[in-house]
């Protein structure tokens, strides 16, 4: 048992610490704790906080950018719709104006064509009247010439006829005179 007591005594000797060793252990622990706290934990905590703030800042900026992007997208969609509506209105207006311009151009062309046709008809009528008057003048001139020739021929024929009638009448008168002279001569 002595052995047992001695071994238990040795055992408990190692369990009960020495005050100096315990104080040195506590001081070294405190120094190590302060060293780790000031040189490892705090810089690591600051770095983690900076990193967390940096990431949170980027997350906030990303969220803000996404919100702004959504707003800009909505604005651009709205502007796109407005632009499409404006284009549709512009297209309709331009079609209406083009149709109006075409109608006006058609009317103007038709009016000009009618005016040209009327002027052409007037020119044709004037030309036709001029040709008719020339034709009538030619016909009249030809008729006058024919009449003159006919009258000249008739005048010649009349003169010849008149001369032949005068000659026949003279012959007849001579015959009567001769026959009346013969009767007078017989009757004497």
Curated annotation (Swiss-Prot):
Location(s), subcellular: Cell membrane
Membrane-crossing segments per the record: 19-39
An annotated Gene Ontology molecular function: proton-transporting ATP synthase activity, rotational mechanism
A Gene Ontology term for the protein's cellular component: plasma membrane
Pfam families: ATP-synt_B (PF00430)
Membrane topology: Single-pass membrane protein
Disulfide-linked positions: none
Job of this protein: F(1)F(0) ATP synthase produces ATP from ADP in the presence of a proton or sodium gradient. F-type ATPases consist of two structural domains, F(1) containing the extramembraneous catalytic core and F(0) containing the membrane proton channel, linked together by a central stalk and a peripheral stalk. During catalysis, ATP synthesis in the catalytic domain of F(1) is coupled via a rotary mechanism of the central stalk subunits to proton translocation.
Subunit structure: F-type ATPases have 2 components, F(1) - the catalytic core - and F(0) - the membrane proton channel. F(1) has five subunits: alpha(3), beta(3), gamma(1), delta(1), epsilon(1). F(0) has three main subunits: a(1), b(2) and c(10-14). The alpha and beta chains form an alternating ring which encloses part of the gamma chain. F(1) is attached to F(0) by a central stalk formed by the gamma and epsilon chains, while a peripheral stalk is formed by the delta and b chains.
UniProt record similarity statement: Belongs to the ATPase B chain family.
Protein name per UniProt: ATP synthase subunit b
Encoding gene per record: atpF
């Amino acid at each position: 048992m002595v052995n047992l007591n001695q071994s238990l005594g040795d055992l408990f000797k190692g369990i009960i610490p020495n005050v100096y060793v315990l104080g040195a252990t506590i001081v070294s622990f405190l120094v190590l704790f302060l060293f780790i706290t000031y040189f490892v934990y705090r810089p690591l905590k600051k770095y983690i906080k900076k990193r967390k703030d940096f990431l949170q800042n980027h997350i906030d900026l990303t969220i803000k950018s996404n919100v702004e992007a959504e707003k800009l997208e909505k604005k651009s969609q709205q502007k796109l719709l407005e632009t499409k509506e404006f284009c549709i209105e512009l297209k309709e207006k331009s079609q209406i104006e083009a149709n109006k311009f075409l109608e006006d151009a058609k009317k103007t062309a038709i009016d000009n064509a009618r005016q040209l046709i009327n002027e052409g008809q007037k020119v044709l009528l004037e030309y036709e009247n001029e040709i008719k008057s020339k034709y009538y003048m030619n016909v009249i001139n030809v008729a006058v010439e024919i009449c003159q020739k006919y009258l000249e021929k008739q005048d010649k024929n009349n003169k010849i006829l008149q001369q032949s009638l005068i000659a026949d009448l003279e012959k007849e008168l001579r015959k009567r005179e001769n026959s009346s002279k013969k009767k007078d001569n017989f009757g004497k």
